[in-house]
Amino acid sequence: MRIEYVDSFYSQPFPGTYMRDFGQVKHFFEYNPHQLQEYKTRCEHELALPKEHLVALAENLKDFNQGLGCGEKTLHNIELLDQGKALTVVTGQQPGILTGPLYTIYKAMGTIGLAEKLSKELNRKVIPVFWIGADDHDHEEINHIFIPTAKGPKRITLAGKPAGRISVGNIPIPDIALLLEELEDLLPPIGWKNQGIELIKRTAHEAANLAEWFGKLMTFLFKDYGLVFINPVLPQVRAITASLFYKVVTTAPAVNQLLQASCQQMLGCGYTPQVQGEKDKLHLFWYNEHGYREALYYKKGLISNKDGTRTWTKGQLGELCLTNPAKFSPDVVMRPVVQEKLLPVLAYVAGPGEISYYALLKRIFHYFAMKMPVIYPRPNITVIEPLIKRLITKYQVPLSCLTYGLEEFIENYLQQEDQLGIETVFNELRGTLKEKQGEVVKKLSILDPDIEGMGKENLKRLIRVVNSFEEKVKQRHRKNNQVAIQQLQKIQHMTQPMGQWQERVYNIFPYVMKYGPGIIKEMYHLIEISDWRQKIIFFD
């Protein structure tokens, strides 16, 4: 296994600027991720905060992580947190089936790597924490994965669908037989496949819900690295954030007004806000009597669900926050604030979308007497298997094409293979046709002035015939180069599936089943966490 780097960053304007030229967007953030002194400043800030709740939190973390099958290093890290001796580097993700897209794995790697790096540089205990977004209710987003095949990505989907907007952490695992059958059919009978299938079966059987299943698989992959998982849906965790929910409710619409101000600031700087501030939104959800997660809104002095079938005064709902905080969960705006309330967060390892929405939260952090942590971009990785590497070498495909797509390269290749110069031949034919037909029309128009107009229509028809002929010739040329085109498209399918970066589409388990779980360790030790460029990892 080896690594190469491509000098490219996220295509989205704001996170791209964050990574290339932080100075342009620094006013949206609290700390500069490039400067060690900023981490020291953040460290001092976090160590000065009250830590009474960490004992209760650590007890919950210990129980939850032991249930996931964690290693001794994770338990040791939780003990350090319990004693108030550790800071955290945090990342998070919705609990997708079989761990979801590849970038979930890269987030975990980045978090472990940054925690290790900062522990050495600051001479303090810094532990990695993974926030399982178990309160998310978007089942359609997490119920499937894509498997790489020679013909492109193949989607496989978990059977079943919840009756309503139920948090993933409350959804029992449905029958996975069909999922496993499809997975077995798509993957070759080599390597670690049988063990991988058994791992998936066992963890699905042991887990109480989709979030736990995710946690068990992630724990298996990262057991040796001390990664601590937190499930915010658990009542004991929610209880710690009761006062935070109370303030959101009783001071409404303050949070939404602060968000709107940040959105306007970002628009004024020429960027589109990642989170569009919705009018009247409270930025909390509550669980109704069916367990469905409903957004809350503040209108005309009252708080209600979206359709207005339930209403409360600020006082009524505020009291419910204190007496039954498990009935509430934060939205994407309040989640980082809840995270800050629970943990001594030194840094957050973020994807491009998260970089953009954190940029809107500085005012909201300040409103709750907090400071936003250091925001650190997660590793951006494309993996290349041996067959694809051979094809890349054969056709001399530049590495930059692996991140931006091969469409232009394929067209250029066809032009290079075109010994006849098809386009030039037909351009000359069109030019000659226009010239000769024009001469004929000019001569004949003395018979009748209408002939000139007829000639223009005639020329259009002739050009269409020539264009059609040209397209058929090009199709023959493509057919003659079909093997090359198919091989180049195979590179495209494996590196830019569906026109997206590989890390956003494919899942880690097809690679784990082919090469074994040891690839996690190899990849982790290969990447340099402080190099933010696109990483191309070649498997042996």
Curated annotation (Swiss-Prot):
It comes from the Bacteria. InterPro entries: Bacillithiol_biosynth_BshC, CC_BshC, Rossmann-like_BshC. Its EC number is 6.-.-.-. GO terms for molecular function: ligase activity. Keywords: Coiled coil, Ligase. Residues 455-491 form a coiled coil. Involved in bacillithiol (BSH) biosynthesis. May catalyze the last step of the pathway, the addition of cysteine to glucosamine malate (GlcN-Mal) to generate BSH. NCBIfam families: thiol_BshC. HAMAP family: BshC. Belongs to the BshC family. This is Putative cysteine ligase BshC. It comes from Desulforamulus reducens (strain ATCC BAA-1160 / DSM 100696 / MI-1).
